[in-house]
Amino acid sequence: SVSIFKGDVVVEASGNNIENFQGNVYINKTSYQNPKGTYNFDDFTIISSFDQNRIRTITVNSPDIVEGEIVGKYEFNQLENLVKNSLGSLYTNFKPSKVKKGQFLKFNFSIYNKIIEIFYPDISIGSNTIIKGNINSDNQEFKLNFNSPQIIASDNTFDKQGYYKIHYQI
């Protein structure tokens, strides 16, 4: 099936590749259309910056998709392997992919139901749903905390009973 993403994008940034890109991206008048329907989104911004130690902060401010930030020192082309290694470390026979040392990231996001509704129409999450955690390549640390006041999946509802909290640490 075909999906259509429309919107106005304004970029005020510097850098010559994704690894040193910093600045602001403004996304306005956005809509996403798929066979299920058309979804309009409030204007939002993505800000990428570095501190004096070259630690990157990416902040997303979208009032109806997701709000939060990722902070860390990592290479985009190694993110997939960082995540795979973190999840794979749960298994005893997992062979991790090689990644550069010194990479880490922390994330903290509030996720809104609209984005879940688009990709997973049978799932609904409550307001104030938060996902946060961190990944560290050197000590293979992986922490994940997911907290939602309510999750509805198909005909199942989880609320106020502790089923909606997931905390995992390695």
Each predicted region: which residue ranges?
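Interface amphipathic segments
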Residues: S1-I170
